[in-house]
Amino acid sequence: RSSDLENIRLYSVGSHAANAMHSVRPEFNIRPLIYGLPDYAAEKFSHYDLSYAGGRPLFATVGSFENRKGQDIFCKAIRLLPPETMKKASFLFVGKAAEAEMMDAVRSLTADCPDNVFYVKRLTRDEIKSLMAQCTCLVCASRDDPMPTFVTEGLIFGKPAIVSEHTGTAGLITEGVDGFVYEDDDPEKLAERLAWAIEHPEKLAAMRPACRELYESHYSKQAFSDSLQQAVKE
């Protein structure tokens, strides 16, 4: 009954989580309350040597290897790239192997493309920050991800991301301004975004101020504080 909900306030970490709840309880009024991350770019951290990536534009993804995270979709998209385009970039997968199918897809790709596809099981917090500072673009191919933290960490350093529509981040991105969204968990659509990004690194670099602004307006500790105070007032 609607009267039962009068004193209940519901909040979600973004539109993706809200949509999931609305699929079963469409009458709920759900407000956004997104986490806040520290400004890692203002901190000092040790340098992570990425020379193995060959100095090419680096596209990275971070997260445990499981079906939900969609590493297999990213692998398929890389394989769909025109050979000449693929050779212009490097790709890094970071994460522990939670599911064999995802790990097999990555290992097969690194075996077939050892010069520009790389796998690292674990990075320290400092190494993650250094990766974000140095990479060109993040890729989140998740089939279901309320608000991927590593994409937000990239925004702190002004780095754009290519994300699945099934992420919370997708609801905040302005296409081509501070990121890119692809649809339907479709490797071909992801490959199209990847190919454009690889061929236009200067345009990705020009997106940095907008990416940083996205962090400051939605994901900073100040933004979280403001949202939380507003929630308490409501």
Task: Please tell me what each predicted stretch does.
Residues 122-123, 130-135:
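Short alpha-helical donor nucleotide-sugar binding micro-motif in glycosyltransferases
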Residues 189, 196, 203-218, 224:
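A short, well-ordered alpha-helix in the C-terminal region of glycosyltransferases
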Residues 175-176, 180-187, 196-201:
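Conserved acidic donor-binding segment of nucleotide-sugar-dependent glycosyltransferases
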Residues 51-69, 75-78, 92:
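Conserved donor-binding/catalytic core segment of Leloir-type glycosyltransferases
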Residues 160-163:
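Short hydrophobic beta-strand element within catalytic cores of glycosyltransferases
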Residues 17-22, 90-115, 127:
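Short, structured helix-loop element that forms part of the nucleotide-activated donor/catalytic region
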Residues 143:
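Aromatic "clamp/platform" in nucleotide-sugar-dependent glycosyltransferases that forms part
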Residues 3-32, 37-39:
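A short, active-site helix/loop in glycosyltransferases that binds the activated sugar's phosphate group
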